[in-house]
Amino acid sequence: MGSGRVPGLCLLVLLVHARAAQYSKAAQDVDECVEGTDNCHIDAICQNTPRSYKCICKSGYTGDGKHCKDVDECEREDNAGCVHDCVNIPGNYRCTCYDGFHLAHDGHNCLDVDECAEGNGGCQQSCVNMMGSYECHCREGFFLSDNQHTCIQRPEEGMNCMNKNHGCAHICRETPKGGIACECRPGFELTKNQRDCKLTCNYGNGGCQHTCDDTEQGPRCGCHIKFVLHTDGKTCIETCAVNNGGCDSKCHDAATGVHCTCPVGFMLQPDRKTCKDIDECRLNNGGCDHICRNTVGSFECSCKKGYKLLINERNCQDIDECSFDRTCDHICVNTPGSFQCLCHRGYLLYGITHCGDVDECSINRGGCRFGCINTPGSYQCTCPAGQGRLHWNGKDCTEPLKCQGSPGASKAMLSCNRSGKKDTCALTCPSRARFLPESENGFTVSCGTPSPRAAPARAGHNGNSTNSNHCHEAAVLSIKQRASFKIKDAKCRLHLRNKGKTEEAGRITGPGGAPCSECQVTFIHLKCDSSRKGKGRRARTPPGKEVTRLTLELEAEVRAEETTASCGLPCLRQRMERRLKGSLKMLRKSINQDRFLLRLAGLDYELAHKPGLVAGERAEPMESCRPGQHRAGTKCVSCPQGTYYHGQTEQCVPCPAGTFQEREGQLSCDLCPGSDAHGPLGATNVTTCAGQCPPGQHSVDGFKPCQPCPRGTYQPEAGRTLCFPCGGGLTTKHEGAISFQDCDTKVQCSPGHYYNTSIHRCIRCAMGSYQPDFRQNFCSRCPGNTSTDFDGSTSVAQCKNRQCGGELGEFTGYIESPNYPGNYPAGVECIWNINPPPKRKILIVVPEIFLPSEDECGDVLVMRKNSSPSSITTYETCQTYERPIAFTARSRKLWINFKTSEANSARGFQIPYVTYDEDYEQLVEDIVRDGRLYASENHQEILKDKKLIKAFFEVLAHPQNYFKYTEKHKEMLPKSFIKLLRSKVSSFLRPYK
């Protein structure tokens, strides 16, 4: 992997021009070879050189080039390798064979011709092939005629040649005297008995394959150099010394000749010489789970993308990308062969793995009636002065109070009773209870609705709200009381009260003995905090004892309609303050007597726990989950939305009909507005409560009975008190419209545009926003800090993070294109710097890189010593490479620049690096330059796997710990990879072993 660019190209061009100027005369050099003005021999080659030429004799000739003489190869001791005759020709030679032989494929050996194979050798009856020749034979009762091919029937009588008993081995001649004389065929000699014939070397080379010598006993066969005589005394056997015996692979000399064998992964062919690769993938896919790739002499299993090969190098296992660091910003869901990133509520996915805050306010003000404030992961609607409070749906504003308070608001009940000398108090919270465990030693509980608070600058002298709700100021007085209590030898832990201790809390009795109907309070905030008593001389309790502090804040209201002629608002206020103080006094006693209860979802909870004080009390197991959580396997998990924690069963229970819970880990559910105990079980937010007006309808409070949105308006949400106008005088085709798309616009806007109701035209979405749908009146702002490359974007996928560059870590880190693994933005420039500690150098692995290859290098990644174009360049590319590469930096520090054009985009890169001790530079260089590191697909996958590359980096950064690492990672790395590293590390660290 690398660039086609040549570092220092400009320098090279300058050198070429300088040399051209210096040798301007040489630049006009004459090519004597082309013009024919050379004096080379006809059997020589002319080679032009600067300002001259040289002559070289052709192959097969010898001399100085100006005089060349043919080399007679046949004069060599081995006859040029020819086993029979060698014929010298100009510049070469050729081998020929005797009659009865033909030249072998190697051009040197001679093999017997089987004359009988073609036309029976011309024999009338039978043909017998012999080395270098053949003979015709006749059946019984016949003898061979003088032409040595036809057969003549023998007569029964007579002493002439026609008689079968004439005794001649070859030819019988009748003499003039009536006798017979025997003769031999050409190449044979008559023996002393004048009847038999003796073979000579003149016939069929004496039956010898190579050389033949005549002796008294007959021909004696011999073999050419590097051949041996067979046990038959005629045939010459090849040896492994000659052309490896003709074997493709291994050759073994045997009594019957050469014996060829093939290595593992190859099969010997029928010619007993050639080896052919076995395609293991043809049988059962080679045993591979996914992909089998045949290689020369072997095969290799590989896995589909998203899977990794196990150490048995056959089976594939899904890669759990979610186990890697930095895979997803929020939630990672592993899937077979892949993964999926999800974002928390209020965030949107971009760049495949990243989450950015959604600016809900950019989408028609988030649906708010008036103001909208974006917050991380959410947003908040606001009501301006004079428009009342925020509606329960969180978007509309209620009408200003008409001096009768807010009877529908959630109330908390604080009730106390006295039985003898014992005071028992209970805090009952029917709705809007919030439980928040702050730590192992504390929690907070809030109940009810706090009174609206004014901004500090506008607070009244008594601290009450002086906001725009003037009627609330006049009609309702908010009274606040705060108290702090201390419980010794107890620890903050909300736990269910034992049945034997339960006593019903009655109503508090006022100073005059009358029932206290004002024990309802609008809001209570309770905080429990446990800490250990510090050691000291003044400590009244033994060191290490638990001390629990309870902090209680109460809010109550006094209403104008409760005034009488004898007691106005100030009088009512004083009464309420006295009653609250009396309640707090009884509350303090009940706390000291361990008789203060928190009543949620029909269950009584104690706030602090004094272990071992009550006989028979069940000890809580140390491993139990805290309230608001349930056990899932070995972990404690918060109760999800739509459920609440039931203290008696210690389980998460779905919210009953008519209630909802949008928070996790709560002890009760909130009542739906106007609840009639109808609705789904397990409702997760107020919008799922029953009886709400559906989209396209509205009502005064958002509940039935509802009215359809008038023509010219629409409402996309449920439970709303109003409908939004189309704007610009536009109308709708029908009542009950649920979207701006139902408005009759003058033009139909396509994705990437929004309809401007002022000028009735389609406007392109500005940069940094997008619109995927038709006929909309808004563009959504890109999530988080992302933006688009151009205006008119149609998808959130076109939103990209442009942040990149910076100073990188001294030991390890990543060089990552902006928005990775999503496509990087156009027209961006990133600069990174790596400056290792002293005596450390940089190793970089490029697993893969994706840059557009058709834009003529508009997008470039370069790594060099510093920003100067003439500094030492380590790496430069403008192309896509999916094959990994590892290399060491050519300089001690690196300046890295990534620059993109305005037109193109691609996936980019995530390039890891590590710094290593320069004492191991030779070893690291040896490893990364070894082609075997990249030859196998499985080795390449190691350089792409985030976990395995980390293990590889550990070896390179600390080679002395190699053997410890291999034991740790041997279950992760292929054996071939470990073998490669082991040989190099061992030879470097233990050179003499």
From Swiss-Prot:
UniProt PTM comment: N-glycosylated. Proteolytic cleavage produces a CUB-containing C-terminal fragment that retains the ability to bind to TGFBR2. This reaction is catalyzed in vitro by MMP2 and, to a lesser extent, by MMP9.
Main location per the UniProt record: secreted
Glycan attachment sites: 417, 464, 685, 756, 785
Keywords linked to the UniProt accession: Calcium, Disease variant, Disulfide bond, Dwarfism, EGF-like domain, Glycoprotein, Repeat, Secreted, Signal
Record note on what altering residue 97 to W does: In SSFSC2; decreased homodimerization; does not affect heterodimerization with SCUBE1 or SCUBE2; does not affect localization to the cell surface
Subcellular location, record wording: Secreted; Cell surface
Pfam families hit by this protein: cEGF, CUB, EGF_3, EGF_CA, Ephrin_rec_like, FXa_inhibition
UniProt superkingdom: Eukaryota
GO MF entry, a single one: BMP binding
Signal sequence bounds: 1-20
Residues in CUB domain copies: 804-916
Bilayer-crossing regions: none
Domain EGF-like: from-to ranges: 29-69, 70-111, 112-148, 157-198, 199-237, 238-276, 277-317, 318-356, 357-398
Cystine crosslinks: 33-46, 40-55, 57-68, 74-86, 82-95, 97-110, 116-127, 123-136, 161-172, 168-182, 184-197, 201-212, 208-221, 223-236, 240-251, 247-260, 262-275, 281-292, 288-301, 303-316, 322-332, 328-341, 343-355, 361-372, 368-381, 383-397, 804-830, 857-878
GO cellular component: cell surface; extracellular space; plasma membrane
Outcome of substituting residue 204 to D: In SSFSC2; uncertain significance
Entries under SUPFAM superfamilies matching the protein: EGF/Laminin (SSF57196), Growth factor receptor domain (SSF57184), Spermadhesin, CUB domain (SSF49854)
An annotated GO BP: positive regulation of BMP signaling pathway
Expression sites (tissue/organ): Highly expressed in osteoblasts. In normal lung, mainly expressed in bronchial epithelial cells. Tends to be up-regulated in lung cancer cells.
Described purpose of this protein according to its UniProt entry: Is a positive regulator of the BMP signaling pathway, required for proper chondrogenesis, osteogenesis and skeletal development. It acts as a coreceptor for BMP ligands, particularly BMP2 and BMP4, facilitating their interactions with BMP type I receptors. It is required for ligand-induced recruitment of BMP receptors to lipid rafts. Binds to TGFBR2 and activates TGFB signaling. In lung cancer cells, could serve as an endogenous autocrine and paracrine ligand of TGFBR2, which could regulate TGFBR2 signaling and hence modulate epithelial-mesenchymal transition and cancer progression.
Subunit structure: Forms homooligomers. Forms heterooligomers with SCUBE1 and SCUBE2. Interacts with TGFBR2 through the CUB domain; this interaction does not affect TGFB1-binding to TGFBR2. Interacts with BMP2, BMP4 and BMP7; the interaction is mediated by the CUB domain. Interacts with BMPR1A, BMPR1B and BMPR2; the interaction with BMPR1A and BMPR1B is BMP2- and BMP4-dependent.
Disease: Short stature, facial dysmorphism, and skeletal anomalies with or without cardiac anomalies 2: An autosomal recessive disorder characterized by reduced growth, skeletal abnormalities, a distinctive craniofacial appearance, and dental anomalies. Cardiac anomalies have been reported in some patients.
Record-given protein name: Signal peptide, CUB and EGF-like domain-containing protein 3
Gene: SCUBE3
